[in-house]
Amino acid sequence: MKAFVLFLREVESTHQPAIDAMISAKAYGLDAEMFEGYTPSRADEYIKRENLKPYFPGPKLYKIKWNKGGVRGCMISHLEMWKKCVELDETVVILEHDSVVVSDTWKTPFDQLLHLDKHRFVDPDPDLDKESNVEKLEHYRKGQQQLQGTYGYVVKPETAKRLIRGAYEEGLTAADMFVKDLYCNIQVVTPRAVKVNNQESLTSNRDFYI
C-alpha cells in the first residue's frame, strides 16, 4: 500500500523527521514517499483560486482554528492528498512529518477511514501485544465524531471523494475537525500502527505564516 508523508519544503525542520517517518513506514511494508504540503501563504492562494470557503457552523472554536495559518496549510495539504488518492484509485496511508510507523496493523480490514492511533501521546501503547482489532473511534467535539489528529490514517478512494466534495460544498476547517461522521465511518485500529513524535505542531503556532 502506498503511503504519503507530508512535509513542508520551506520548513527545514520538517525534512529529516519526514525522512525518518518514511523509513519507519517502509520498515513495516508501506510504499512510502514524501508529499510536499502547503505553507499558509500558498494555502491561501489555493483557497482563493479554488473558490473555497471556511466552515463556520457557529461555535467560536472553528473561527479561532481557521485564523491560524498552519491550520489552513494543513487542511489544503490533506485535501491534495485525498485528490491523489482518488487519482490513483487506491487506498492510501496518510502520515505527517512527525509520525512514526510502529507496527503493520495498518493492514487490518476496515470500512471507510481508519485512524491508526487510539491512544495519542500515551506510551507505551496500552494495547501492545494484543490481537489487532478495529472499532469505532470514540472521539467527539461539538457533537460530531472527528479524527483525533491527522498524523496517521488510512483512507479509501470513495471516502476521499466524499471528503473532497465536502470541502467544496460545505467548507473547510482544521483537517482533524473536517474529517467527521458526516462524510465517513471513522474507525480506529489497536494496537497502534502510528504514533506522533512531537506534541508541538505548526498548526498551533499563531505566528506561523510563510
Task: Name these PLM-found stretches.
Residues 1-95, 99-210:
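An acidic/histidine-cluster motif and surrounding catalytic segment
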